[in-house]
Amino acid sequence: MSSLLQLLAVWSQSSSISMNSEVAQTNQKYKDHSFLVSQSFYSPFVNSCYWKLVNRRADLLKILFLRRKGDMHSHLFSYTFIFYFLLFKILSLHPFREPAKINI
């Protein structure tokens, strides 16, 4: 019985370590991408929306990965994340740039 409990403890610890490594890899990916975004031609409003997403990414990832079925509170967080992500994607299409001129 004690060996079963030890095995369960080791398994839960290894699963939390793998979750932490996934979050760390995602953090590094966002850090690399955020440098590129800060050097690009985004408008200040789009850039501020991006940084709001970056600052909340780890908490949102944990909520998305660890949510329980039927937990409405975490579902609301998921929908909020999806809304902000789509808003960022729509605003990042550079609507303020002058359209290309085609000479025929």
Swiss-Prot record:
It is found in: Membrane. The keyword Signal applies. Partially overlaps VMS1. This is Putative uncharacterized membrane protein YDR048C. It comes from the Eukaryota. The chain crosses the membrane at residues 74-96. Keywords: Membrane, Signal, Transmembrane, Transmembrane helix. It is a single-pass membrane protein. GO terms for cellular component: membrane. Residues 1-16 form the signal peptide.
